[in-house]
C-alpha cells in the first residue's frame, strides 16, 4: 500500500561515485525514483541535559495522581494552569484536562507511537502504560510473533536493528521519555500524571509504543524513519508522535542551513518519508474500530523562524507550536505554515528564557542519566524540565489520544481525516493575547544573568500559530454528531476455509449491552457461535452468506461472511 513495497535498498562499493550510481540507476526504465538515504540529525543539542526535579519537591507532588487539580499540580501547568507556577503565569492557559477527565482518562485500546529516542519503558510512571507485544521476549533474537521484528516487546530500535530499546547511551537526552510522560504517565500517585494515562487503576491508560530512530550521539536516516512509521501502523498505533523535523526553510542562516520552503520541494526531496507518512495516515487504525487511518502530529521546530518545519508544515499532518505559561508564543517557536497555518495547533511548550525560571518549562518523566548535575538528590528523581515545540507536541498527541479513548467509550467511529478536522476545530483563540511585545533572555538557562535581553513582536504571530488545544472541547465535539462520527458496526467477516475468526462485540456495543441471538442465511458456508459477546465464525464452505446479530436493546445489525481458500501468505 502507498507503494512502500516498491522501494529497494541498494548497496554498493564505498569507492564508487554516489552521484554516478544514482544517475545510472535513474536511467533504468523500471526505476521511478532514486533517493539517497539521507542522514537525519536531531533538532536539539544532545550535550544539553534537562534540569532535574529534586527529591524534596518530588515528595511534595506525590498527590499529583488525584483526579482533580490540587495545589501541587501547578508544576504541570500545561495540564492545569492556576497561574501560580511562576510570576507572570496566567490562569487557564493549559490544555484544559481537568474537566475532560470527568468524562474519560484514557483507554488501553489507543496506542501512541513515540518516534524518537528510546522510551524508558521501566520508568515508575510509564511501565504500566507501555505497549506490550505479548508474544515477544525483550531484546530476543527470535521473532516469536512473525511480524518481521525479533524481540519487539515494547517497540523496536531501528538504529540498532533489534528489539532492545535503549535510553542511557552517551548522547541520549531523555527526550522520548519526557514526551511519553506528557502523553501517558500513569496516574499512580508516585510522580506526575499524563493527559491520557488513566485513573490509576489497571488497564485505564493509553499505551506508548517506542519506535526508536535515534540512539546515543549518532544520527538516523530516512530509511529508519520509514521503517519505524510503517511498523507503528502495522502494529496498532493510531497516533504518530513526532517531536523531530528538518530545519525551517526560513531559519536564520547563522543558526543553520535552511531546508524545505514548499510542499513540492519537500515531497520531491524525501519521497520515501512522505510515502511512509501517507501509509500511516491511510492504513493505521481499523475500518471497523474507533478510527480508520492514523493521525500524524509533528513539532513546529525551535529556530525562532517565521516558517514551521517539514514534515509538520505539510497540510495532511498536524503541526504544533509552543506557548509559555502566560499563553504567549514561546520565544523559540517557529510559526507560519505554507498551508496558510490551517494545520497548526498551539500547546504548552515552556519558556524558561522568558520567565528566568525552570518551572516555566514542562515537567515530565526522565531517565536519571539524562538529568544534569552531580547532585544525586536531583539527578536521581526521575523527573525533569524541558522546553520546546517537542514538549508542546505531546500535549496535542495526549489530547488526541484522550479524544479517541472517549470515542471508544461511546462506541463511535471516525475517519482519520475527520478526526484531524475535529482536533483543529477544538481550540481556543489566542489572538487577544498577541499584542505588544514579549521579553526574553536568550540562553538564560545556560548562561544565567549574562543572557542578552531580546524582544518578540507578538502581532506577527497572530493567525500564524494556531489556537490552543482544548481537551474539554475535543470531548464535547465527540459528544456531538459532527465531523463524520458514525456508530461502530458489526464488521463483515473474512475467514479462511476451516479457520475461525472472532468478533469482539464488546468493542461495538455500549456497556451492559449483550448479543442475544444470531442468524446465518446459509449455514453451510459458516458455523457461528456466540459466547459472552464473542461471535466466533468458522469457515465451512467457500462462498458468501448474509448474517445478522441482535442485541439486548433489540437492535439487529446485518453483516456478510466471506469464506475463501488461503493461498500462500494471504488472500489472492
What are these regions, as identified by a protein language model?
Residues 2-17:
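Aromatic/histidine-rich interaction motifs
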Residues 4-7, 26-111, 119-125, 129, ...:
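Protease zymogen maturation seam
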Residues 88, 94, 98-222, 235, ...:
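Subtilisin-like serine protease catalytic core
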Residues 229-269, 299:
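Short acidic, glycine-rich surface-loop motifs adjacent to enzyme active sites
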Residues 237-244, 293, 405-500, 570-572:
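C-terminal subdomain of the subtilisin-like protease fold in secreted/lumenal serine endopeptidases
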Residues 263-295, 316:
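Catalytic-core regions built around general acid/base machinery
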Residues 309-405:
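Extracellular S/T/G-rich loop segment that most often corresponds to the catalytic His/Ser-adjacent loop
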Residues 483-572:
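Extracytoplasmic soluble-region selector
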